[in-house]
């Protein structure tokens, strides 16, 4: 109970330090989040829920572009996430969608790691080589890509956790840790959903698991959009000042 109380106090302390413009963004994100959760509960098949989710992910890209204009890796990672969602939500090219998600996770890895370019290149070649060798030798490509995605996500969780331990008072470091923990919770639900659909375990809880995917996923992207390793750009500061004056 004490840990929960401490966590809530930490969240409240974070909220008090959010500039006015960020509170406007936060309110927008919360409205979208609460609305699509209510729609999923009351009318699970309504297409408007998917549209709201899609718009919410796109807003994360816009937010990062405005606030952290100089952090190109974060912006690209969020845009690739949005692109992957576009492919997975609106098309049947699931393998392509997972492939784009792998690139998104790799961009997050790039922005968090301290590896040299040489070691980073070796890492990328080894991981990619193992993945495509598995697919070429008879494995199913989407499963190989899923394995690559899982390795990159776990690496990002580890890097975010290390950053959080180093910089516990840094709001952005905490956002990164919260974001990637929620991300992995989301993907555990995705994995469980596919296991249920394949008939390996009972599908009795399938609607709940499918619901939880977005309960975890959407806030993960909001937190990650606030986890830049860069300082707020001059462009973002100028926007915040103009909003505060008005």
Where do the protein language model's features map onto the residues?
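Polytopic alpha-helical membrane-helix bundles and their juxtamembrane interface segments
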Residues: 2-246
């Amino acid at each position: 109970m004490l840990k929960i109380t401490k966590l809530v106090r930490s969240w409240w302390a974070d909220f008090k330090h959010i500039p006015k413009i960020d509170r406007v963004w936060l309110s927008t994100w919360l409205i979208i989040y609460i609305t699509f959760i209510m729609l999923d509960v009351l009318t699970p098949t309504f297409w408007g829920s998917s549209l709201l989710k899609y718009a919410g992910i796109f807003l994360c890209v816009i937010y990062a572009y405005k606030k952290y204009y100089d952090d190109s890796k974060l912006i690209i990672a969020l845009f690739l996430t949005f692109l992957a969602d576009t492919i997975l939500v609106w098309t049947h090219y699931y393998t392509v969608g997972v492939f784009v998600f792998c690139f998104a996770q790799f961009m997050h890895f790039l922005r968090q790691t301290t590896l040299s370019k040489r070691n980073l290149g070796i890492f990328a070649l080894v991981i990619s080589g193992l993945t495509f060798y598995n697919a070429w030798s008879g494995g199913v490509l989407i499963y190989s890509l899923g394995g690559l995605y899982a390795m990159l996500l776990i690496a990002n969780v580890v890097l975010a956790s290390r950053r959080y331990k180093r910089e516990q008072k840094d709001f952005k470091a905490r956002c990164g840790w919260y974001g990637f923990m929620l991300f992995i919770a989301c993907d555990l639900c995705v994995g469980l959903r596919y296991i249920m659909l394949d008939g390996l375990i009972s599908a009795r809880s399938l609607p709940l698991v499918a619901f939880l995917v977005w309960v975890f996923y959407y806030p993960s992207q909001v937190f990650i959009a606030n986890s830049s390793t860069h300082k707020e750009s001059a462009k973002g500061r100028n926007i915040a000042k103009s909003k505060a004056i008005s």
